[in-house]
């Protein structure tokens, strides 16, 4: 097999070395010419895999190390008989850790008690669904809007988007980018909806940039709106709006899901799908390649404050403020320089582990145990 992989996909050799020749390119450089002699294509969300790129090529399998598939022309895949796989849920936990880090940063700035807020989660799939479980496990009030899931689960606890926007103090977006269809999400938060947000609302977008109208949001913030914003995704990536970023409390270069586990899990999942397509046995597993965590464990005193424990556990694995600082330093120079810097920050992103790898002892204190379980850490 002739395999072409995005150069930023980790451990391609570990999983695919015995399957043929492997060539690597930057994801944005993968085009029609690059696919002329390729059987298997492995990509991330930065590569548009379209009819124009694939027509006439020998590509028979496409794997994307992402949850979303809006960069894949699935209609053409079906027409051309091209097998494909995404990696649903691969980086979901990393995104949840990112959102928790943003909430802690916002609470610190606002002097707010996270337990007293009402949370609105828009999109309850792989990422949003996990976030809802964590927030409710902590005993916090959560409203959920997910029309497609509500149609499948008519007895579920769902609310309309209008009610969520009217009642939630914190809004976290986790929808795919759908430009058409029954439930389009492009500019789901458009100018009228953004303007109608309650004063003091916190908005987090770690889904797709165009789910929020970036220009409308910038105008709103420039006008002095009482709104705290954390953005990890941007319209027109890798070109992020520096004026919008300057008005966000947290601004990062699409790295919410960039945990080490998430990256390796994505490669492992498309390898599993590839093996199923080929009808061959898997020779490598995620556990074979996942290194030990840097932090072996934490011992909490039974008398410690649960809110302090929550913040300590979350920040033990991730604090978005370091990524925010690095991103802001990159927002200088001309457009080409900023675009290159955006991709460079993602390419050279340092290792980050997930909270699920933390082993935490609580001395048997029930409230601390509840916090540890809700976060998904390992209780010992």
Swiss-Prot record:
InterPro entries the record matches: D-isomer_2_OHA_DH_cat_dom (IPR006139), D-isomer_DH_CS (IPR029753), D-isomer_DH_NAD-bd (IPR006140), Erythronate-4-P_DHase (IPR020921), Erythronate-4-P_DHase_dimer (IPR024531), NAD(P)-bd_dom_sf (IPR036291), PdxB_dimer_sf (IPR038251)
Pathway: Cofactor biosynthesis; pyridoxine 5'-phosphate biosynthesis; pyridoxine 5'-phosphate from D-erythrose 4-phosphate: step 2/5
Catalytic activity: 4-phospho-D-erythronate + NAD(+) = (R)-3-hydroxy-2-oxo-4-phosphooxybutanoate + NADH + H(+)
Top enzyme category: oxidoreductase
SUPFAM superfamilies with a match to the protein in the record: Formate/glycerate dehydrogenase catalytic domain-like (SSF52283), NAD(P)-binding Rossmann-fold domains (SSF51735)
Statement: the UniProt record of this protein carries the keyword Cytoplasm: yes
Oxidoreductase found in the keyword field: yes
PROSITE patterns: D_2_HYDROXYACID_DH_3
Residues that bind substrate: 45, 66, 258
UniProt-recorded Gene Ontology molecular function terms: 4-phosphoerythronate dehydrogenase activity; NAD binding; protein dimerization activity
UniProt keyword terms in alphabetical order: Cytoplasm, NAD, Oxidoreductase, Pyridoxine biosynthesis
Gene Ontology biological process: 'de novo' pyridoxal 5'-phosphate biosynthetic process; pyridoxine biosynthetic process
Stored Gene3D superfamilies: 3.30.1370.170, NAD(P)-binding Rossmann-like Domain
Binding-site positions, NAD(+): 126-127, 146, 175, 206-208, 232, 257
Subcellular location: Cytoplasm
EC number, as in UniProt: 1.1.1.290
Active site, UniProt feature: 208, 237, 254 (proton donor)
GO cellular component: cytosol
Family: Belongs to the D-isomer specific 2-hydroxyacid dehydrogenase family. PdxB subfamily.
Oligomer status and interactors: Homodimer.
Main function: Catalyzes the oxidation of erythronate-4-phosphate to 3-hydroxy-2-oxo-4-phosphonooxybutanoate.
Protein name, entry field: Erythronate-4-phosphate dehydrogenase
